[in-house]
Structure formats: C-alpha cells, structure tokens
Regions:
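Residues forming the flavin
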Residues: 2-425, 429-431, 435-489
Length: 489
C-alpha cells in the first residue's frame, strides 16, 4: 500500500475541486487532489487523450482559459511539493482516523497499465468534497433502445473521444444544458434534427433579479441560440418526447406539444426521424462519500438530494467542506466560486496566514445561487413524463424492473418508501446501483403513495458503504491503521 500525508485532501478535480485546491495551496496548505479521471477538469473540462486527433478546446469548452491557467498553476505548485496530484484514483471509502481522515483509493485502468497497482491511502487533516454530478434520466417508452443516450453522454463522446454520437440527432429533455450539447454536435458535423425542450426560457421573466445578477449566463445562452440558428437547428419549446421508435435500434421519436397545464395538446403528436436521441433532465449530485461520512442533506429546488453547507461551505461533519454540484446543481461558475470559498475556509482552519478576503466571493456566490434557483424553477420536470409510464415501461435496466413492478410493490405489497420498494422489486440492485433508475424510482414511489418525493426516497439509492466498484482482494485486506510520518510508500 502507498500512503500519503497531507493537510487537505480535495476529492474531485472538476471546477470546484480545482478551485478549492488552488486556493488552499496558495494559502500555504499542502494539498492532495484525488480524482478518478486520468486528466483534470472533471466532466465539464473533459478532454481527449493525447494523440486522439486535432483538437481546438475553445470550440468545445466554456471557460477554457481559467481551467488551463489553474491547471498550470497547480502543476507549478506540485513541483514545489505543495500539491500532490493523484489522477486515476477512485475513492471508495473515507474513514475517520484519529484527528485525520483516511481516504482509501483504488487505481483505474491507466495507472495499472503503467505498472502501478498498489492501493493508495491519503491521510489528511481536512477534506473538501467536490464529487460533482451525473446525468439524471427518466424512463419513457423505448428509452432502452440502442441509439438513446444521455445528453451528457453525447457531450462526453465529443469532448473525450472527438466522436459525434450519430448522423441525425435529436437533443431532448429540459434545461440550459441541452443548448451546448446541440451546439457542439452541430458544429462538429452532426445533423441536429431538433432540440425538444419541455419548458420555455420565457419563464425567466418571473425572476428579473436573478437574471440581472448573472448577466453572463444570458449572454452565454444567447450565443448558443445564435449558433443553433446558423446551423438551422429548430428549438421546440414546451415539447416532450413521448416515445422512442424502432425495433432493433432507434429510428425516430414521437413528440408532442404541452399546453399551459403541462398536458399534451390533442393533435400535436408527430414523428421525427433520427438515429440518436440524447436526453437530459438535469443532473443528480454524486453523494456516496458525503453520505458515507454522515453529512447532513436536504432537498433542493429541483428535488435533488444535496449536501447542506454553511456560509463557509462547511458540512455538518467537523473538518469536512463540500462545494460544487454536490451542494446544489448550479453550473461551473458557481462551482468554482464555492470551491474557492471551501479551500480558503479549510486553509484558515489549519492556521494558514495568507487567506484572502472571502466577501466578494460570497456576494458572487449569492448571485449565482439565485440564478440557479430560478433556473430550476423555470425548467422543472413536467409531471406528464412519469404519468405516461405504463406498467410495461422499463425503469431499472440492470434488473429489468418495469414500472408495473414498482406500482405493485406500493399498491399491493404495502411499501411506503423507496428503500422498501428496492427490497421488494429490486430496482437499483444491479450494476449501476440506482445511479440510472434511482431518481425515477423515488419519484414513482412517491407518486403511488400520494405524496411528494422525500429525502429517504433519494437516500435509498445514494447511501452506500462502498462508493465505487472495488476488487474483493482490497476488501479482504486490512486497512492501514497506522498513520505515516510523512509522504511516501
């Protein structure tokens, strides 16, 4: 086993994690940045492997200059010993070890290919959790057909492999994220047949203060809309995908227009041909590690389970801070601000002398959080999506559990919350452990019991004692109890 001793461990190297690490390191704290990716940037600044082909980052990435300058500075600090960068390290458990935290990692495929296979434990006096989020998916007829992918998956293929997902693509769901996905596909050769948006941006008229506090967001959206117009991509607001069509693979989608009550208008259903459907209903915060540590949570405006933090981004667990999507989905700009606040607060708790004034950051965070709250209210998931789930609609792909099995677990077997439904019908018990079907199962359970979705429903699919797949041999080996004297193996 390889062990490292640092002042602060930052888990996650996306926008929030990079900002936290740099803020703390520049304040004089020795920092370890631990991330599952082999290159920094997280999902937002995902980049292709070296040699993958010609690559112009500015065409795919927003805020690329900030990322590269931050990454360069962290590399410079790593050369001085102030920063330890652990890429390709999957954190599967975090445990209290006296007055420190033991961050247990297993290595991904790329480090193993270079001859490094020993497990790694990072001992740190403080933690910043910047674990990010993943695509939120909802079931609908035909969503398990080959050719139906997540909106984030389509973007990941483009950013990480320079691969366009299909020839004729429809981007659907709700939220501003659909625009950069469609824009990226169109700019790199795909024929984007349509963007099917369940809501309308006119809803921002109800939140003038939030829009004025984040004018950059408005300009960003206007830029995407202008480029889509130049590529002749039609954006259909207040429309939803009612079903994916095809036998062996996707051949088209059935869409319909929603009225002001969120119902499908009679006579508006029509078919659009496509070979790929990229669907996105927002994001689900990745909370395995915060829940493992016992951090308090609450439901956010978008019905996500998120970590509760104070003004310093501190969680309910002493010595642990959280930043970014784990504390509420709000985009990369908000994540970087929260990450910097968390990094500075963690550094101050360690006695760092040169901690910057955080008041401007807090004002910026307040504005961005206001915009995020407005965004979630403008782009809610329409009730009609889950209402149209017939008993035959597959919900859990891993265990092949349909919507009827979930309904019967509640109506016939008496389940009153999602954990019991999980035990009775087995949704979320397969390979993905509920990462794909968990939110939908929680919502369907709440619907059948006649109530709103609650924290316990969502915790049932995120509360895991092991945060990521780990070899059985690692579980069989004892964890290191002794604390190392310093960095080393």
């Amino acid at each position: 086993m390889t062990e490292h001793l640092v002042d602060l461990a930052v888990i996650g190297a996306g926008p929030a994690g990079l900002a936290a690490a740099l803020a703390a390191a520049e304040a004089g704290v020795r920092v370890a940045v631990v991330d599952a990716g082999v290159r920094p940037g997280g999902q937002f600044w995902r980049s292709p492997a070296p040699g993958a082909g010609p690559f112009r980052p500015a065409t795919l990435h927003h805020g690329w200059h900030w990322f590269t300058s931050t990454d360069d500075r962290l590399t410079e600090l790593a050369g001085t010993g102030r920063v330890l960068r652990l890429a390709g390290h999957h954190v599967w458990s975090v445990q209290a070890a006296g007055d420190q935290w033991a961050v247990h990692c297993v290595l991904g495929a790329e480090p193993r290919q270079h001859g490094t296979s020993a497990p790694v434990t990072v001992h740190a006096r403080r933690l910043v959790l910047a674990t990010g989020a993943y695509d939120r998916q909802l079931p609908f007829p035909g969503w398990d057909l080959p050719g139906v992918i997540t909106a984030g998956g389509a973007q990941a293929l483009l950013k990480g492999n320079l691969v366009v997902a299909g020839q004729r693509v429809i981007v659907a769901g709700t939220g501003p994220f659909l625009l950069p996905v469609a824009d990226g596909l169109a700019r790199h050769g795909a024929r984007v047949a349509a963007v099917i948006e369940a809501n309308s941006p006119l809803g921002f008229a109800r939140f003038p203060g939030a829009v004025l506090g984040a004018t950059g967001k408005l300009g960003e959206a206007t830029g995407y809309a202008g480029r889509l117009l130049r590529h002749r991509v039609a954006v259909h607001h207040r429309h939803v995908v009612l079903g994916a069509l095809g036998t062996d693979r996707l051949t088209g989608v059935l869409v319909g227009r929603l009225d002001r009550n969120g119902r499908v208008r009679a006579g508006t259903e029509r078919q659009i041909d496509c070979d790929v459907l990229a669907v996105g209903w927002g994001f689900t915060p990745q909370l395995e590690l915060p829940l493992q540590l016992g951090c308090a949570t609450h439901l956010d405006v978008d019905k996500s389970l998120v970590v509760t933090v104070d003004d310093d981004q501190a969680t309910s667990v002493a010595g642990v801070w959280a930043a970014g999507e784990a504390t509420g989905v709000g985009g990369a700009d908000l994540a970087t601000v929260e990450g910097r606040i968390a990094g500075l607060a963690a550094a101050a708790s360690l006695g760092a002398d040169a901690v910057a004034d955080g008041r401007p950051l807090r004002r910026r965070r307040s504005s961005l959080r206001g915009f995020a709250s407005a965004m979630h209210q403008v782009y809610p998931i329409p009730d009609i999506v889950l209402e149209r789930c017939s008993d035959e609609t597959l919900v859990c792909r891993c265990e092949e559990v349909d919507a009827g099995s979930i309904r019967r677990a509640v109506v016939d077997l008496g389940a009153t919350e999602a954990r019991t439904v999980k035990l009775l019908a087995r949704p979320g018990m397969g390979w993905c452990q509920g990462r794909v079907c968990g939110f939908a199962t929680a919502c369907l359970t709440a619907r059948h019991t006649g109530r709103a979705v609650a924290e316990p429903d969502l915790r049932a699919f995120a509360d895991r004692s092991i945060a990521t797949p780990v070899p059985l041999g690692r579980l069989a080996a004892p964890l290191a109890d002794e604390q190392p004297d310093g960095d080393g193996g």
